[in-house]
Every structure is written in C-alpha cells, then in structure tokens.
C-alpha cells in the first residue's frame, strides 16, 4: 500500500461507498513475489482506510468474477492498466461492467511510486533466517508447486533471484534458492 493507492481511494470516495477487491496471497504469488504482509494483515490495513466500507478477496487478477458477483455501480482503477499486461484485464472488466450497466472510472496514475519499487527497496535492506523461514511457510500455503534452484556462488544466486519469464500474462520466477556449504567450500578449493 502506498500513497498512489490512497490517492485512488480518495478519488473513488467521491462516487460512494468503497469495496476493495484485495488480491489474495495466491493471486499475487502467481504473478510476482509473495507480498511482505499476508492477506489478513493487508485486509486489516485496507479496511481501516477512511472511506473503505468493505474488503473482499480477489482470487485472480481478472476483475470480472468479482464485478459479476458484487455488481458495483462504479469501478475505479488507476490509469496504469491502459497498456501492458494489465490491458487484457481492463477489457474483461469493461465487458463485465457493460453486462449489468456498471461504469468504469479511470483515475490518473500517481507517478513516481509503485508496489514493485517498494518491494525492491525492502529486498535491498536484507533478511534474516526467521523471515526466510516464515516466507517459505507462507509460500507452501499459497502455491501448489514452488520453484527452487541450487546456486553454486553469489553470481548464480543473483541470477536466480532476478531471472523471470512472462507467459500468458503470468510472471514466472524462482520462489527461492539454496547453496550448500559443501558446494561453497569445494568451489574455494577447501572441501569439508
């Protein structure tokens, strides 16, 4: 959550009560890295924002199922989805809104801030074994299959951390990697 989201909520408040479709951990993990806070923690934060009357689980990046289920008079979204991978979801949302007479309100994107940038900044701070262990437990609950790779040295670790592919609008990347002490010491010419 960042000030761009707050700007969006403030503008949406002008149209009435606000129901937020909050992506579940599973939905986020299928497109990018698992969020720092779990769904319940994020929900608690969002439902305490002024003007938010309801928070519902959004199981997928496709808004159409929630739009068909809740049939809001208006759907507010930032203009960042006009192009790129989110554009297909925009078209599906417009189609769902049209089916029952809902209206799309596109609010100008707040420049200079993004969740991805904030995640990268948090990653640069570092982590602890306890945080890594807790993240692994959450990943095991959020995804049916995890992708891990063994790394032999710091360079291959950096590659594993940053490599990804996009297929069918889904970003695939490694969920984690490990390096054995035996491999590390062997590379240094000092086997255990």
What are these regions (language model features)?
Residues 25-28, 154-156, 182-187:
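Short active-site-proximal "capping" loops at secondary-structure junctions
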Residues 5-14, 157-172:
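Short amphipathic alpha-helices and their capping/turn segments at secondary-structure boundaries
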Residues 15, 100, 142-143, 173:
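Structured helix-beta-strand junction loops
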Residues 118, 126-166:
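N-terminal amphipathic alpha-helix/helix-capping segment at the start of soluble metabolic enzymes
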Residues 168-192:
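Glycine-rich, proline-tolerant flexible connector loops at the mouths of alpha/beta enzymes
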Residues 1-131:
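Nucleotidyltransferase catalytic core that binds NTPs
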Residues 20, 147-153, 175-180:
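Hydrophobic faces of well-ordered beta-strands that scaffold small-molecule active sites
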């Amino acid at each position: 959550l960042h000030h761009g989201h707050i700007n969006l909520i403030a503008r949406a408040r002008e149209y009435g009560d606000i129901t937020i479709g909050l992506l579940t951990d599973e939905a986020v993990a299928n497109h990018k890295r698992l969020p720092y806070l779990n769904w319940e923690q994020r929900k608690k934060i969002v439902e305490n924002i002024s003007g938010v009357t309801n928070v519902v689980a959004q199981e997928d990046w496709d808004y159409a199922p929630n739009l068909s289920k809740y049939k809001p008079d208006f759907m507010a979204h930032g203009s960042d989805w006009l192009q790129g991978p989110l554009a297909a979801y925009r078209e599906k949302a417009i189609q769902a809104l049209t089916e029952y007479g809902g209206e799309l309100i596109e609010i100008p994107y707040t420049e200079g801030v993004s969740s991805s940038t904030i995640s990268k900044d948090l990653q640069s701070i570092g982590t602890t074994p306890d945080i890594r262990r807790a993240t692994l437990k959450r990943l095991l609950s959020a995804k049916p299959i995890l992708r891990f790779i063994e790394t032999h040295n710091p360079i291959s670790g950096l590659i594993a951390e940053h490599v990804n592919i996009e297929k069918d609008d889904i970003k695939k990347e490694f969920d984690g990697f490990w390096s054995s002490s035996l491999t590390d010491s062997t590379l240094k010419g000092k086997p255990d």
